């Protein structure tokens, strides 16, 4: 590539040198020419004389010398300044400008043509069926049905496919106003003219049963108005709670994980005047957890660890103050029916009466034995002792087995000795 700036600079330097040489040559030539000034003619009379001689056609040596000097200067000027190069450089500078002008014109025309072609192609695609929605998919919904989400979003088939993701904000606000369970909405263009409506909902914490229908309770403390005829999720059923207590319970249970929440089958309100906010949780593995609403979320975090230590046993896990295990019976089971509790209480009362009767008999027998052990006079004590020793001998002799005697005979002799002693 030619560096045009350097070449132009060299061209200027050469031209300046040539101009200087021309000025020197012209100044030397002017010194030889005659002057019209009369003062100068008086000061230099010899030149006037020479001029007169020239006019008269007389030969002059100085004129010949001047002509020779002019020829020498002209030859030197030809050697130092090359007129061919000067002309060529001028042509090159002009050709450079023409090339730049041609390049700029060609690029501008090319850009305009490309932009015009792009507008034509884009307009054709925008109006063609390739820019129309063919399929709409819904994902992430567990509470709101798919048909309601499609209808509420306002999306329809044959709508413009290009730029559909920019409508996410409009669809998100529309679905949030229609359905309180919707947390956020995202539109995704999946290709092949398919649009995905990705819905994120608030988690359902449990259900409330009213007139054979179930109403979901969300983690954002909202109970939905839409009823369902059956339980379709692994979440507990809330029984016996007022609205304020229900919101308080939902706030606490929202802190539990999905796995732990799925292990709870039912939550019952067992509070009274002495124990407000008292609840019982019926677990899927057969255990029953008793505690308070305010602290149940923190203490249920250790439920799996407690169950692993029980080694398969089931019962009542009390989490009111600390945590301890009890064997389950109808009296400490909040989910037992009144009939079961009454029958179990009757059995307990009967067992208590029997134990009391046994205790009374034992006390009576001990009192009689104490009365029989009162001290007697010495004569009576000696006679009694002799009778006791003799009777003991007889019983020992009778109780000793003899050959040919059976067990029935031995038992009869033992009873006879007991009667004689009495």
UniProtKB/Swiss-Prot annotation:
List the keywords (alphabetical).
Cell cycle, Cell division, Cell membrane, Membrane, Transmembrane, Transmembrane helix
Tell me which Gene3D superfamilies the record gives.
3.40.50.10960
Q: Which residues lie on this side of the membrane: Cytoplasmic?
A: 1-109
Annotated GO biological process: FtsZ-dependent cytokinesis
- State a GO cellular component annotated for this protein: plasma membrane
The entry's localization annotation reads: Cell membrane
As for membrane topology, the entry says: Single-pass type II membrane protein
UniProt-annotated stretches for the region Disordered: 1-77, 329-422
**Extracellular face residues:** 131-422
Which InterPro entries does the record cross-reference, listed alphabetically? DivIB, FtsQ_DivIB, POTRA, POTRA_FtsQ_type
Q: Where is the composition biased (Basic and acidic residues)?
A: 1-23, 62-75, 338-379
**Regions that span the bilayer:** 110-130
Q: Where is the POTRA domain?
A: 131-202
Compositionally biased residues, Low complexity:
389-422
Family label: Belongs to the FtsQ/DivIB family. DivIB subfamily.
Q: Describe the function of this protein.
A: Cell division protein that may be involved in stabilizing or promoting the assembly of the division complex.
Task: State the protein's name.
Answer: Cell division protein DivIB
Give the gene symbol.
divIB
């Amino acid at each position: 590539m030619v560096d045009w700036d350097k070449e132009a600079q060299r061209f200027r330097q050469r031209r300046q040198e040539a101009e200087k040489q021309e000025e020197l040559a012209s100044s030397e030539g002017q010194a030889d020419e005659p002057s019209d000034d009369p003062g100068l003619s008086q000061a230099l009379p010899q030149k006037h004389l020479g001029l007169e001689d020239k006019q008269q056609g007389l030969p002059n040596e100085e004129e010949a010398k001047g002509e020779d000097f002019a020829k020498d200067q002209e030859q030197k000027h030809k050697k130092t300044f090359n007129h061919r190069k000067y002309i060529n450089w001028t042509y090159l500078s002009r050709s450079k400008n023409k090339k730049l002008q041609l390049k700029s014109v060609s690029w501008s025309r090319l850009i305009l043509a490309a932009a015009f072609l792009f507008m034509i192609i884009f307009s054709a695609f925008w109006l063609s069926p390739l820019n129309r929605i063919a399929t709409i998919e819904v994902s992430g919904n567990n509470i709101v049905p798919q048909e309601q989400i499609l209808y509420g979003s306002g999306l329809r088939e044959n709508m413009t496919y290009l730029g559909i993701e920019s409508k996410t904000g409009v669809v998100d606000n529309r679905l949030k106003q229609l359905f309180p369970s919707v947390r956020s909405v995202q539109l995704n263009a999946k290709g092949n003219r398919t649009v995905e409506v990705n819905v994120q909902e608030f988690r359902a914490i449990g259900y409330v049963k009213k007139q054979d229908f179930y109403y979901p309770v969300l983690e954002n403390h909202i109970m939905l108005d839409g009823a369902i005829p059956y339980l379709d999720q692994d979440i507990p059923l809330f029984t016996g709670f007022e609205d304020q207590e229900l919101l308080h319970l939902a706030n606490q249970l929202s802190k539990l994980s999905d796995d732990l929440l799925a292990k709870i089958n039912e939550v019952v309100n067992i509070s009274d005047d002495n124990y407000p906010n008292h609840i019982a949780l019926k677990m899927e593995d057969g255990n029953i957890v008793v505690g308070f609403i305010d602290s149940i979320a923190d203490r249920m975090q250790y439920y799996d660890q407690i169950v692993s230590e029980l080694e398969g046993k089931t019962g009542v896990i009390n989490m009111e103050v600390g945590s301890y295990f009890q064997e389950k019976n109808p009296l400490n089971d909040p989910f037992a029916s009144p009939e079961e509790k009454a029958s179990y209480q009757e059995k307990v009362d009967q067992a208590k009466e029997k134990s009391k009767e046994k205790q009374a008999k034992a006390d009576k027998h001990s009192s009689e034995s104490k009365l029989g052990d009162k001290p007697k006079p010495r004569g009576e004590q000696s006679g009694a002792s002799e009778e006791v020793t003799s009777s003991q001998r007889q019983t020992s002799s009778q109780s000793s087995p003899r050959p040919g005697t059976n067990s029935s005979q031995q038992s009869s002799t033992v009873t006879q000795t007991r009667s004689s002693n009495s």
